[in-house]
């Protein structure tokens, strides 16, 4: 009898906790990688942006940032589409690399329509970095060493063969008559882990993103050899030459933004879209975005969804031509 009553009380407690817990669910941004990379940059920028007075909502606590690495984003994606489909208070960071993984089938049978795309808040660019004490002073120095003996240079990056970081260095290699298949490529879980490996000497080069480099180069321990943009970037990386300036016509833009689960209500989804539109229109957000190393790019809702569908299809065609489709 006592055990039966105890079970009933326990069940009642769970129901009560669940009801009130749902009402007080903390607003969070989920970064599908380890701390210190571009996904974290996205979440931290949104965390600051939502506190702008014109955008902040009464009684809303600070955005919590959580991390769910694994499978170069696949673990977080699968968590949202299978178990957390209706969590309106959970924003998930994505990048152009996420779209590349979708195109190549690295998220299994995932499709663009599996989630609801909220907003793209800025554009990042690829970059190539080494340690401050590296013998490679320029991008040309590095490529000359790779051409002479690719086995002696270890390149770290987020993702596996076929990922956007792999493609960046591969495009530079091809333009220097180097077979990308000869490169020593170490797959790591996010840009933060790649820079940690670089600092520790486990890799000699990082193929990553400018926002990550902005974060990790502040102490002078990292030398950035090139940014993969059409023109030099403003802000902290203003003195870094582009690959084009060094004779290599390679540019790699990367959008950054967030999505929510597929069963988030229309009302909640539209609320997020309108709120991000308002946030991205403020001069305060423009300053915050520039400080993170991101450039101007703002798109949301249906327009963003259409853009992503086209981008994924373009990536799929390119990847198929390179034999990278699973």
Residue ranges and their predicted role:
Residues 52-58, 79-90, 102-193, 243, ...:
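Hinge/capping helix and adjacent helix->loop/strand transition within the periplasmic-binding protein
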Residues 9-19:
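Bacterial N-terminal signal peptides
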Residues 266-326:
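An extracytoplasmic/periplasmic, membrane-proximal ligand-sensing/linker region
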Residues 23-114, 177-205, 296-299, 319-326:
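N-terminal (or domain-start) structured segment
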Residues 212-280, 310-313:
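C-terminal lobe and pocket-closing loops
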Residues 1-10:
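Bacterial N-terminal signal peptides that target proteins for export
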Residues 34-36, 96, 131-136, 158-163, ...:
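Short coil/turn segments
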Residues 69, 152, 157-239:
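Ligand-binding pocket segment of bilobal, Venus flytrap-like solute-binding proteins
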């Amino acid at each position: 009898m006592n055990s039966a009553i105890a079970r009933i009380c326990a069940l009642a407690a769970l129901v009560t906790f669940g009801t009130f817990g749902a009402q007080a669910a903390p607003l969070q941004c989920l970064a599908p990688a380890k701390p210190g990379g571009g996904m974290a940059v996205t979440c931290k920028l949104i965390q600051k942006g939502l506190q702008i007075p014109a955008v902040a909502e009464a009684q809303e606590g600070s955005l919590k940032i959580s991390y769910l690495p694994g499978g170069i984003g696949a673990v977080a994606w699968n968590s949202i589409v299978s178990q957390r489909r209706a969590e309106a208070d959970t924003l998930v960071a994505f990048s152009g690399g996420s779209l590349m993984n979708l195109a190549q089938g690295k998220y299994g049978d995932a499709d663009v329509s599996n989630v609801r795309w909220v907003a793209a808040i800025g554009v990042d660019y690829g970059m190539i970095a080494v340690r401050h004490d590296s013998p490679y002073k320029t991008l040309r120095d590095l490529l000359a060493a790779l051409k002479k003996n690719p086995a002696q240079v270890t390149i770290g990056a987020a993702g596996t063969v076929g990922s956007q970081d792999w493609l960046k260095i591969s495009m530079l290699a091809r333009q220097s008559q180097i077979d990308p298949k000869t490169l020593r490529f170490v797959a790591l879980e996010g840009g933060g882990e790649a820079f940690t490996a670089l600092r520790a000497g486990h890799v000699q080069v990082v193929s990553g993103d400018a926002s990550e480099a902005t974060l990790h180069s502040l102490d002078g321990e990292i030398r950035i050899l090139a940014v993969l943009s059409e023109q030099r970037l403003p802000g902290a990386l203003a003195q870094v030459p582009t690959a084009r300036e060094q004779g290599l016509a390679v540019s790699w833009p990367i959008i950054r933004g967030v999505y929510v689960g597929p069963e988030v209500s229309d009302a909640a989804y539209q609320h997020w879209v309108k709120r991000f539109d308002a946030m991205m229109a403020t001069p305060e957000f423009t300053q915050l975005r520039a400080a993170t190393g991101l450039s101007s790019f703002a798109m949301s809702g249906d327009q963003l969804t259409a853009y992503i569908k086209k981008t994924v299809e373009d990536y799929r065609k390119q990847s198929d031509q390179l034999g990278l489709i699973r």
